[in-house]
Amino acid sequence: MVMMSKQLTAQAPVDPIVLGKMGSSYGIRGWLRVFSSTEDAESIFDYQPWFIQKAGQWQQVQLESWKHHNQDMIIKLKGVDDRDAANLLTNCEIVVDSSQLPQLEEGDYYWKDLMGCQVVTTEGYDLGKVVDMMETGSNDVLVIKANLKDAFGIKERLVPFLDGQVIKKVDLTTRSIEVDWDPGF
């Protein structure tokens, strides 16, 4: 007879958020390098459970252990016990349900909240919609897909996310971001 656990575990994230991804295998015992997208790299371990997608299906994975190794962080997942098993997970995104993330203070937001926001200059020129965010060494960057009839013939704009300097106002209610930016760039 199989014993069923009374603890109900989520089968799939309701509102999936990517927190990082698994890199190449390390050693022969199933360890993997991990790349964290969280502001403080180690914070990725604070949010559980983790999910991955294999062949279009969600799978929950259990973190057994993690440690620093040289410049990398490496992880050991439960049931991943050799290099071959670890290699199957290389490049898998590490996903959690948004309910695992901390509640934000008034006026704060996650990158995911900015996706799809309309970006308008302080002069009222519509630059387009946020389609992605990029991390650079110095600051984050909004990737904005320009409108089809953009007067400057621009398809995509990269606008530095410099709060106060370039970013003048973020309004998640109206899904808009006001920026001090030359539309010709």
UniProtKB/Swiss-Prot annotation:
Domain (PRC barrel): residue spans on this chain: 106-185
Major place of residence: cytoplasm
GO molecular function: ribosome binding
Coiled coil, from the record: none
Disulfide bonds: none
GO biological process: ribosomal small subunit biogenesis; rRNA processing
InterPro entries: PRC_barrel-like_sf, PRC_RimM, RimM, RimM_N, RimM_N_sf, Transl_B-barrel_sf
Function of the protein: An accessory protein needed during the final step in the assembly of 30S ribosomal subunit, possibly for assembly of the head region. Essential for efficient processing of 16S rRNA. May be needed both before and after RbfA during the maturation of 16S rRNA. It has affinity for free ribosomal 30S subunits but not for 70S ribosomes.
PANTHER family: RIBOSOME MATURATION FACTOR RIMM (PTHR33692:SF1)
Domain remarks: The PRC barrel domain binds ribosomal protein uS19.
UniProt-recorded name of the protein: Ribosome maturation factor RimM
Taxonomic path: Bacteria, Pseudomonadati, Pseudomonadota, Gammaproteobacteria, Enterobacterales
Chain's gene name: rimM
